[in-house]
């Protein structure tokens, strides 16, 4: 039996051409293109960065998201049956190759690009920015600045949503993977700032408010602003709606036995106002 993780060059090229045709629909190549590299820990809500970029480019930008190519593996359904939740690591080499090929082809033609990432390391953004600048691109980096408790809850909610859709392939983000990005992102961003490769590094919160721009304050590193936001204390009232949504999804998914569910329930109970004592009924005379 052939290894179903493998795929032929012809299969790959056919899918690549289909993707390119679909992605360039309604988009125009420009004389001075810009590439926007995105960063932020898992669960931070990086897709919300697209709104600011669409506004900046009047919608003339192509989003390249590695995750969207994973299910395009020619043998994806068979791989799901075989590996279930571990399918992601078996299709990632395919999605990585697809992402690289799409970036290469579209940047040859001069389209504005949005390239998803996390900022877990500095190598990939540096390599990508260097390669694109050699093709005449201006490179910018936009990063989510979200308190770590909010993004961690975001990873749980995303998993529960995926589980409701397809329990077999839903894959939780380990807390350790989330925390590694939280720990490394501020220093990595400072390193990227010092390279001078990016004409602007911006920080945004989930509401789309710009918290920092290296273009506006070039002498100030983004590190301090990001660290402050990552470690910002969030009130119980702020996260209560999120906790309630997650609790509801976990009940529907029958995940009440998980440590996460118990921790969320405990937190919600602590946010409830204390029950006032029942007033004693005064005794009536003669009774």
From Swiss-Prot:
Which region ranges are annotated with the description Disordered?
267-287
**Lineage of the organism:** Bacteria, Bacillati, Bacillota, Bacilli, Lactobacillales
Q: What is its EC number?
A: 2.7.1.176
Subunit composition and interactions: In the presence of the epsilon antitoxin forms an inactive PezA(2)PezT(2) heterotetramer. The heterotetramer is still able to bind the UNAG substrate.
Which positions in this protein are listed as binding ATP? 40-47
**Primary role:** Toxic component of a type II toxin-antitoxin (TA) system. Phosphorylates UDP-N-acetyl-D-glucosamine (UNAG) on the 3'-hydroxyl group of the N-acetyl-D-glucosamine moiety, yielding UNAG-3P. UNAG-3P inhibits MurA, the first committed step in cell wall synthesis, which is then blocked. Phosphorylation is inhibited by cognate epsilon antitoxin. Part of a postsegregational killing (PSK) system involved in the killing of plasmid-free cells. The zeta toxin induces programmed cell death.
Question: Sorted alphabetically, which keywords does the UniProt record give?
Answer: ATP-binding, Kinase, Nucleotide-binding, Plasmid, Toxin-antitoxin system, Transferase
Name of the protein in its database record: Toxin zeta
Give the first-level EC class, as a single word: transferase
Additional facts recorded: Has a long half-life in vivo.
Q: Identify a single GO molecular function assigned to this protein.
A: kinase activity
Q: Does the keyword Transit peptide apply?
A: no
Q: Where is the composition biased (Pro residues)?
A: 273-287
Q: InterPro entries, alphabetically?
A: P-loop_NTPase (IPR027417), Zeta_toxin_domain (IPR010488)
Q: Which residues bind substrate?
A: 66, 100, 118, 120, 128
UniProt-listed Gene3D superfamilies: P-loop containing nucleotide triphosphate hydrolases
The UniProt entry's sequence similarity note says: Belongs to the zeta toxin family.
The record places the active site at 67 (proton acceptor)
Q: Which reaction does it catalyse?
A: UDP-N-acetyl-alpha-D-glucosamine + ATP = UDP-N-acetyl-alpha-D-glucosamine 3'-phosphate + ADP + H(+)
User: Where, if anywhere, are coiled coils annotated?
Assistant: none
User: Mutating residue 46 to A has which effect?
Assistant: Loss of activity
SUPFAM superfamilies per the record?
P-loop containing nucleoside triphosphate hydrolases
